[in-house]
Amino acid sequence: MNESNDELTLNNYLPSQVEQKWQKRWDSLRAFSPNPSDNGDPFCIVIPPPNVTGSLHMGHAFNTALIDVIIRFQRLLGKNVLCLPGTDHASIAVQTILEKQLKTEGKNSEDIGREEFLKRAWIWKEQSGGKIISQLKRIGYSVDWERERFTLDEKLNEAVVEAFNILHEKKLIYRGEYLVNWCPASQSAVSDLEVEMQEVNGYLWHFKYPLISDQGQILDKYLEVATTRPETLLGDTALAVNPNDERYKKYIDKKVKVPFVDREIPVISDIHVDKDFGTGCVKVTPAHDPNDFAIGKRNNLKQINIMNKDGTLNINAGKFQDLDRFDARKKIIKELDTLGLLTKIENYKNTVPFSDRGKVPIEPLLSTQWFLKMDNISSSCLKELDSKKPTFIPQRWEKVYKDWLDNINDWCISRQLWWGHQIPAWYVLKQSEDSIDQNTPYVVARNEKEALSKATKEFGSNLQLIRDKDVLDTWFSSGLWPFSTLGWPNINDADFKKWYPNSVLITGFDIIFFWVARMTMMGKTFTNNIPFKDVYIHGLVRDENNKKMSKSSGNGIDPLLLIDKYGSDALRFALLREVAGAGQDIRLDYDRKENTSSTVEASRNFANKLWNATKFVLINKTFSENCSLNESDEKNLELSDKWILSKLNQLNTKVSNLLIEYKLGESAKLLYEFAWNDFCDWYVEFAKQKFNNKETHNRKISEKILIKVLTDVLVMMHPFMPHITEELWHKLQIKPEQILLSLQKWPVLEKKYINSQIDKSFHELFEIIRLIRNLRVELGLKPSQLVPVYLISDNVELTNFLKTLIVDIKTFTKSSEVIICKSKDIDKNNFAQSFSGIIGDLEVYLPFNDFVNLEALKDRLTKDLKKVNSDIETLNKRISNKNFIDKAPKEIVDECFAKLKEGNLQSEIINKKLKLLK
């Protein structure tokens, strides 16, 4: 059934109605569900999966807009396009939410057990976890929702299990006791990348250890240390000094007594001790500090863990047992002071590692964990980078990626949580055994049946299997995302064969370490391919004060509020127009009280402009047959027709090239300028003149060109503003609803129309018209007051061109007549009482006449001059202030000088005009 054009001509633009209509229709027609056997080169983006706990923020909206522009553009180019969506299970975030829910019931996860906890997690995921997906749909994402994935889906879990087994078989995964970043809040290990370093105003505590004689007696001599963590002295197993430090050479191999725990520890030498830190003598706590752990390994020191997993002190802490680590710190300081062992407290700015999730200081803790060896994996990716695999856009992010690969550590991949991919490892115990330690043997398998077979083969039949309780780091499964979503490990899956490697990854710079590098390493390891050809890194969304938008800063914006007010097309286009270049941050203003944004409102106004332009075209359309230009039409094109067709095809070339290069902001700006200025403000006005002309043939040509240009603009605009362009395209084309603009082809480039000389001539014409309009405003003329205008030039080519458009100039400038002549043919003394201007080879004069109220004009110019001179005085005072020149940012100082120059020019112009009026 065809849609009625009457609906468009009668109704105003209501974004919510248009957007809901087309989102439903795209879904019902399965518009974005490609078949791998379809024609067209493959193009694939697998979207960064937002956390299932998340709700839409402006960063998501920005990322979505960027991805969707590229996806829709490539689809219009005729590619076989897959954009695959999904969500991440977000282990720690979900576990935290459920633990809080249990706390309100007076329970914890241990009370209800793993099975019941996971039941609750899945129920929560089904009820609340899909919120962000429904929000993403509001933006108009052209993804294949039928292929939507979740990182805990059965098939993706199979991929994770297979990956773990392969890595273990390659001896890249191992189990060992190491210092890990422990988050007492979530009671889980976290990776280095989940640690946020924060500068904290703290203290450096100095205290001393009594020396012990060779006979074992406590001496009245001491060695002093300085530390930011005095509570860890309870786990000290040595003091260390630099072997080249003359102050301490005599103490090497002596012993000291650790306060409170009655432990004798040696004084050792280690070249890595910094002689200039504190006293030059350091306490060594191998179980609670990475540097101390390394010293302990080199010197065979005992490792004494004093910490429980919840951040309280354990039995090794003696009388401080069960105290929270920070409460214990206070008590230990107090007692050291009482014992006369505290010597000094210094204010000290310290960089403290915080858990990104738990928001508490990390505790380095000895723990048996699963690790993934990274050296060989990262090396293979570094080799690929030599061949620009992947290519980073902008290129500067390649160095960040490379530096991380160059300085990589083994990855702790186990987490002490229940929600996630359970590690596919089973501990092998005798039937009589019931406890697991770090020496318990284990097997890694794809399922329990395989595990039992492996264990029986290696250890005999009288055994029991207990599966490891831990889950894998969320980033482990996310690292497989580009290919597990396409069917891997089944490399014969049609989707995998068609769309892997992916074409491009679009993401923020903040997860280059977390995610991008891990995907490249996993992809190279399991598929021998880098998983995407290009990596487009976008910037942050900032507010009008250039501050990063975030919920914690209180300046975050809910995109749905702006979508409800202005429409998703307006929000998308606003964000994209703000992109100055790949990787650049963008700014978005927002009035929280009024729920308004001038940036988004401008894009909504642009949508209205397109809507009204289409109304105009349809109202004035007088035929329903083929709208294509025929040979006869081409011969009868007027200059304005040739000009708009030239501009249209130049636009096509520029925009398509820019989009291929991911220059989305530049593309958006060009489309805006053409549609608003060239088409709506100029060509539509030319067309109106023709519609008033009785020559029906010219009118028909103009109608055809209006439809052609507007249609091509709608197609090129479609990736940016998909809903309104789909609606208007259907109105223009009178197409059945089953035919979609989304699935059409990019406009054919017609180079024959490109004419640089016509472009130049029309540019001059528009400058002339703008000048005349400005002069009329300065004279205070009303639109109804028609005055003559004189255009004087000896440039024959220019004057001949202007003469062909004299009627248009007269109409556009509200002139009674337009006189075009050479300078020798007119006496310029006649223009003594005129306002004038010069553009290139052309002089423009508007003589005064009875319409001009000279006294009112003098008053207005005098007021303008007073204001300009006042501004000049203020600026002169500012730049005369040495303090301002020395301390203000350079761009502010430069701006002041530029404003002063402009002010002086304005003052000179106004004074000249006032002279004319005397």
From Swiss-Prot:
Q: Which Pfam families match?
A: Anticodon_1 (PF08264), tRNA-synt_1 (PF00133), Val_tRNA-synt_C (PF10458)
Q: Which UniProt keywords apply?
A: Aminoacyl-tRNA synthetase, ATP-binding, Coiled coil, Cytoplasm, Ligase, Nucleotide-binding, Protein biosynthesis
Localization, UniProt: Cytoplasm
Statement: the UniProt record of this protein carries the keyword Protein biosynthesis: yes
* Segments carrying motif 'KMSKS' region: 548-552
Please describe the quaternary structure of this protein: Monomer.
Residues involved in ATP binding:
551
Cross-referenced CDD domains: Anticodon_Ia_Val (cd07962), ValRS_core (cd00817)
Q: Which reaction does it catalyse?
A: tRNA(Val) + L-valine + ATP = L-valyl-tRNA(Val) + AMP + diphosphate
The record, for InterPro entries, names:
aa-tRNA-synth_I_CS, aa-tRNA-synth_Ia, Anticodon_Ia_Val, M/V/L/I-tRNA-synth_anticd-bd, Rossmann-like_a/b/a_fold, tRNA-bd_arm, tRNAsynth_Ia_anticodon-bd, Val-tRNA_synth_C_sf
Which BP terms in the Gene Ontology apply to this protein? valyl-tRNA aminoacylation
Record note on domains: ValRS has two distinct active sites: one for aminoacylation and one for editing. The misactivated threonine is translocated from the active site to the editing site. The C-terminal coiled-coil domain is crucial for aminoacylation activity.
Q: Which organism is it from?
A: Prochlorococcus marinus subsp. pastoris (strain CCMP1986 / NIES-2087 / MED4)
Question: Under what name is this protein listed?
Answer: Valine--tRNA ligase
Q: Which gene encodes it?
A: valS
EC annotation? Answer: 6.1.1.9
Residue window of motif 'HIGH' region = 50-60
Its main subcellular localisation, reduced to a broad class, is cytoplasm
